[in-house]
Curated annotation (Swiss-Prot):
One of its GO terms (molecular function) is methionyl-tRNA formyltransferase activity. (6S)-5,6,7,8-tetrahydrofolate binds at S109, L110, L111, P112. It comes from Pseudomonas putida (strain W619). This is Methionyl-tRNA formyltransferase. It catalyses: L-methionyl-tRNA(fMet) + (6R)-10-formyltetrahydrofolate = N-formyl-L-methionyl-tRNA(fMet) + (6S)-5,6,7,8-tetrahydrofolate + H(+). NCBIfam families: fmt.
Length: 310
């Protein structure tokens, strides 16, 4: 079977690795154009491109698949199937129709819940009990196609966006390989999604990461976990930015953002309902530290009565 793979970040690269170890022929890889990255803003290849180059697989990086030249280039590859994982470009219907068996997608949620750009973080933020990977046939709509296969994992009370991402990135590749086998032998037909159950995982916005201390502590604790490692929740103290990488629910009352206590166990801050104990912070110019270490060296900065977010 001739497969074209389309993907961009590390999550997609894990899927490409599994396909390279499978009996299927990867005839080409599509990925987004190189982007500036790092302090020097040098053009850097995507994780998928780096892996493809290392395996001598032809790489295509069109800025769009909406023009006829890009579509003709894909058609010339004569693919049987296109596997799309976190590619980042919209595939018009003419592209979806090029492969003999169509296009399939590995999506990091239990569809139809959390269609869209940020399903992993939104699942943690919402307090979902479980997440997973859905392999589906692609349609012109956003993550609306018939579902071929699902794998499920519970979301634990200490899962972050990063830890759930890594777990799903490890689960998804085997599901894709299994789905391809099912398509090849005709055993997988696909289950139509119930649009009435659909929710949308909107793209992450850095402004969302600014902590609003008037919100309930339970919501903020989930948000802090969901946005770790990016975009990372933050607030201000004494006019300086403070990144909050970990917190746990606590008790106490005060004005939203008010420091209620500080000890080696954490910095307890009042919220709109209950309080949070901040256990891992990062100050400007420093690295992320357990609050125990900050408390020992910067005790005066975290005096009771000070207010975060002002």
């Amino acid at each position: 079977m001739r497969i074209v793979f389309a993907g961009t970040p590390e999550f997609a690269a894990e899927h490409l690795k599994a396909l390279l170890d499978s009996p299927y022929e990867i005839v080409a890889v599509y990925t987004q154009p190189d982007r500036p990255a790092g302090r020097g803003q040098k053009l850097m290849p995507s994780a998928v491109k780096a892996l493809a180059v290392a395996h001598d697989i032809p790489v295509f990086q069109p800025p769009t698949l909406r023009n006829e030249d890009a579509q003709a280039e894909l058609a010339a590859l004569k693919p049987d199937l296109m596997v799309v994982v976190a590619y980042g470009l919209i595939l018009p219907q003419v592209v979806l129709d090029i492969p003999r068996l169509g296009c399939i997608n590995s999506h990091a949620s239990l569809l139809p819940r959390w269609r869209g750009a940020a399903p992993i973080q939104r699942a943690v933020e919402a307090g979902d009990a479980e997440s997973g990977v859905t392999v589906m046939r692609m349609e012109a709509g956003l993550d609306t196609g018939p579902m071929l296969l699902k794998v499920v994992t519970p979301i634990s009370a200490d899962d972050t966006g990063g830890s759930l991402h890594d777990r799903l990135a490890a689960m998804g590749p085997a599901a894709v390989v299994q789905a391809i086998a099912g398509l090849a032998d005709g055993s997988l037909q696909g289950e139509v999604q119930d649009d009435a159950l659909a929710t949308y995982a909107h793209k992450l916005n850095k402004d969302e990461a600014r902590i609003d201390w008037s919100r309930p502590a339970v919501e903020l604790e989930r948000l802090i976990r969901a946005f770790n490692p990016w975009p990372v929740c933050h607030s201000t103290l004494d006019g300086e930015s403070v990144k909050v990488l970990a917190a746990k629910l606590s008790t106490g009352e005060g004005a939203p953002g008010e420091i209620l206590s500080a000890s080696k166990d954490g910095l307890v801050v009042a919220c709109g309902d209950q309080a949070l104990s901040l256990t891992r912070l990062q100050l400007p110019g420093g690295k992320a530290l357990a609050f125990t270490d900050l408390f020992n060296s910067r005790r005066e900065k975290f005096a009771t009565g000070k207010v975060l977010g002002q």
